[in-house]
UniProtKB/Swiss-Prot annotation:
Gene Ontology cellular component annotations, sorted alphabetically: cytosol
Species this chain originates from: Magnetococcus marinus (strain ATCC BAA-1437 / JCM 17883 / MC-1)
Keywords for this protein: Cytoplasm, Pyridoxine biosynthesis, Transferase
Pfam families linked to this entry: PdxJ
Binding positions (3-amino-2-oxopropyl phosphate): N7, R18, G192, G213, H214
Pathway: Cofactor biosynthesis; pyridoxine 5'-phosphate biosynthesis; pyridoxine 5'-phosphate from D-erythrose 4-phosphate: step 5/5
Disulphides: none
UniProt record similarity statement: Belongs to the PNP synthase family.
GO biological process, any: pyridoxine biosynthetic process
Localization per record: Cytoplasm
InterPro entries per record: Aldolase_TIM (IPR013785), PyrdxlP_synth_PdxJ (IPR004569), Pyridoxine-5'_phos_synth (IPR036130)
Cited NCBIfam families: pdxJ (TIGR00559), PRK05265.1-1 (NF003623), PRK05265.1-2 (NF003624), PRK05265.1-3 (NF003625), PRK05265.1-5 (NF003627)
Name of the protein in question: Pyridoxine 5'-phosphate synthase
Catalytic activity: 3-amino-2-oxopropyl phosphate + 1-deoxy-D-xylulose 5-phosphate = pyridoxine 5'-phosphate + phosphate + 2 H2O + H(+)
Length: 243
């Protein structure tokens, strides 16, 4: 069964919009876990636009599943991860003015810096994933520098303007998943996935986990967090059963 990591960043976005103490990401994590979430993902950005340091600490203390901490491979972030020791860290590219992560890491062009970051996190007992575009060269480089997991960026698939373009992007994701498996990497995927487009991705070969945030939080506004998570889990189960 494919695992579901629920990204709760936008619970914090709503809180920070008014500078209030609510809604609390910890409450959202509890609800997601009750509904079957297999992990909780948070992106601690360097500008602290949504998730705060306190949130990560409290989630570490209270989550019943595991924490997947998304972060830039910067010295301040690495130092925090070494202190907090979340079960998983996903290294992502970060631009201060972007609304959301716009693409995957350039592992090929930043091989030495990322290799050092991966080694430091491994030494702290943290499983490390790299957020990469479904590019065969980038995936091979991720394996070469010691990453355990690649999370494939599904944004181009999600944002494809036509079905033909979406099919092309899906084919590339299939090739990339196969390449990752050949390199001994665990395959995760995420970004831009919704209730309408998740099922083809859930059928990717060797896929172990999906990380989904915005769509689930948006749905939760209408039906509640537990119902939103259960609905996504159902779609994932059905996708795996249907060839």
């Amino acid at each position: 069964m494919i695992l579901l990591g629920v990204n709760i960043d936008h619970i914090a976005t709503l809180r920070q919009a008014r500078g209030e103490r609510y809604p609390d990401p910890v409450d959202a994590a509890f609800a997601a876990e009750r509904a079957g979430a297999d992990s909780i993902t948070v992106h601690l950005r360097e500008d602290r636009r949504h998730i705060q340091d306190r949130d990560v600490v409290l989630l570490q203390q209270t989550c019943q599943t595991k924490i997947n901490l998304e972060m830039a491979a910067s010295e301040p972030m690495l130092t925090l991860a070494e202190r907090w020791k979340p079960q998983d860290c996903c290294l992502v590219p970060e631009k201060r003015h972007e609304l959301t992560t716009e693409g995957g890491l350039d592992v090929v062009g930043n091989r030495h810096r990322l290799a050092d970051a991966v080694a430091r996190l491994h030494d702290a007992g943290i499983r490390v994933s790299l957020f990469v575009d479904p590019d065969l060269e980038q995936i091979s480089a991720a394996g070469a520098i010691g990453a355990t997991v690649v999370e494939m960026h599904t944004g181009r698939y999600a944002n494809a303007a036509t079905q033909a373009q979406r099919n092309l992007e899906l084919e590339q994701l299939y090739r990339a998943a196969h390449q990752a498996s050949l390199n001994g990497l665990t395959v995760h995927a995420g970004h831009g996935l919704t209730y309408h487009n998740v099922q083809p991705i859930a059928r990717l070969p060797d896929l172990k986990e999906l990380n989904i945030g915005h769509a689930i939080i948006a749905r939760a506004v209408m039906v509640g967090m537990e119902s939103a998570v259960k609905e996504m889990k159902r779609l994932m189960r059905e996708a795996v059963k249907t060839p």
